């Protein structure tokens, strides 16, 4: 089969995996109140809001997911060097990363909550730990497995020269940054502040004054994940999927347009860079058009 068709197929699969990974990563961070919402949940007891959120963030998502995916990639790489099946190795690597993720989540939650118990009266809810740990580890396993499989495809089929653990680390940092900047805003600036008028942002005076009541009963991280699965998680997945697909597509297109095997690598690289700049310019124009349309349609926020 033609190598270009194989590369395009691997690229399409990588884009689909990236979409699933981005969505799962954002929903996992919503269950655990990591990144954007983290500081608001941390401040809530100091503002008199005793809550039932799971708060597991010691670091930002780029650092933590860089760790998880790098662990999975390193374990999978070591197992593959022993001669085991690559798919089995990737599954085992993601499984080890899931255990690391679970230990990290529990220690972070208990450390943060216990630190606030004495001075601010925030109790440790053990049922919150047990009910939230499964979705956190489960969503994390899905995200990590998809990304380590993407790293394997990039290394074996798409011709990436870097070793599997390093590619996995880069993918983990990337998805963490996207989830933090794209999806978590839906939770940290909207879901946690539904009692305030929409569109006003989060003024400093309101920091920590989060919603602690749900539609029925007290709110927790599971409610937030359900809410964000309709928009924040989807947007994170689409963003990561488009980045992976478009970046790989411009590389494949550069190889095609260079003139086959007779073209030079430098020519292919220049073509890929030009295509990338064109894509960035088009996306910037679309972003500006959407922003102007939204401001003209809904007007500035007043009170």
Swiss-Prot record:
The gene is mtrE. It catalyses: 5-methyl-5,6,7,8-tetrahydromethanopterin + coenzyme M + 2 Na(+)(in) = 5,6,7,8-tetrahydromethanopterin + methyl-coenzyme M + 2 Na(+)(out). It is a multi-pass membrane protein. The chain crosses the membrane at residues 3-23, 63-83, 86-106, 133-153, 157-177, 226-246, 266-286. This is Tetrahydromethanopterin S-methyltransferase subunit E. It is an enzyme of class 7 (translocase). It is found in: Cell membrane. The complex is composed of 8 subunits; MtrA, MtrB, MtrC, MtrD, MtrE, MtrF, MtrG and MtrH. Belongs to the MtrE family. Pathway: One-carbon metabolism; methanogenesis from CO(2); methyl-coenzyme M from 5,10-methylene-5,6,7,8-tetrahydromethanopterin: step 2/2. Pfam families: MtrE. Keywords: Cell membrane, Membrane, Methanogenesis, Methyltransferase, One-carbon metabolism, Transferase, Translocase, Transmembrane, Transmembrane helix. GO terms for biological process: methanogenesis, from carbon dioxide; methylation; one-carbon metabolic process. The keyword Cell membrane applies. InterPro entries: MeTrfase_E (IPR005780). GO terms for cellular component: cytoplasm; plasma membrane; vesicle membrane. Its EC number is 7.2.1.4. Part of a complex that catalyzes the formation of methyl-coenzyme M and tetrahydromethanopterin from coenzyme M and methyl-tetrahydromethanopterin. This is an energy-conserving, sodium-ion translocating step.
